Amino acid sequence: PEIIDLAKAAKDANCDAPKKPHMILSNYTTPKASHVLLANVGSGSTFFINIDSRAIVGCVNTVGGFNGVGGTTNAHASVASPDNSMAIVANIGAKDESGFLHKIQTNYTSDDYKLVETLALDQFTNELGTAVARPICHEFTSDSKFAYITLAGGGLLVVDVGSADGTTPMTVVKVYDKDTVPGIGCGVSRLPFNKIMTNGESGAKGGDDFLYTFDTSKAVEGVFPNPVQIELPGEDTHGAVTCIDQKGDIFGITSMRVSNDVNFVDLQTNKVVATQSMASSFSPDPKPDVAHIVGNKMFIALRGAKPLSAIGSLESADRTPGVAVLTISDDCKSFSWEEEDLASMNDSKRMVTLKDGSEVSASDPHGLE
């Protein structure tokens, strides 16, 4: 694989070195994406990286927030709007405290990026039914007017994102409480037909996991129906992508990080139609995380032996950190993968020690696009 030294690239761009690069997502320029947005969950910064040159062409640190409203180093995900006018950063906040949403005005032609607004989320805890409101991931509706925000304690916020320059502020227009949307909030995908798909995961301890689909078609009218809730087999749903079968039907494919399963969900009937394990002789404990699909190839980040986030309590020398490339069947109900379909990211120069004393690679992949 091509390797980019982010510390050097940041220095070359007059940006501070990143800590814990986490989620990487592209913008929506045509005919193809021009930039990716990299959220650094240990340093509170978002890097804007030119895809062709691989250079960091902008960096925005959201620690402290706009006009001191608030913001920590925990910038979990930075997502571009479909019209490319803004990006919203989900800032988890400090441990046991509520987080923030930051708005960055974006211009990918001039590489001009500036923080214009911060929204504190502690004011929504009562409606959510949670002690804190910690945003995890989000996605915009196709018209770039609303963002659906998942939360660590369950529940979901729908935000009218306002204007790109911040003169019209972000406003929460719908609160789904934790009983309506249970589970640790995770990834969000925009589906056809004005729908948004999210996950509700059980985390490292296991428990109930869900896939949700939200009808956004009447959001501009202030109508927000309750989501369709689909219970998932396995433990700790995380990555989710979609697949179109030979008949044109759409399926959700979800990776279960703790139990190493992949679920196939018929989104016409809202039923799980197949579950398949990723565990194999060449990857006994893969720990599949964030996923992306191109054609019939599903790319999944596989976590490391000593995870840096979320499942840090689950150590194992049987991990194979890297990227798995699954070939999805034409009917979107199964996958195949072989040892040659694993792009290893093991790094023998950087080792860590597990609780059992074994020495393993420090590599711990997470986001991919």
Where do the language-model regions lie?
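Predominantly soluble domains enriched in secretory-pathway, periplasmic, or organellar proteins
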Residues: 1-369
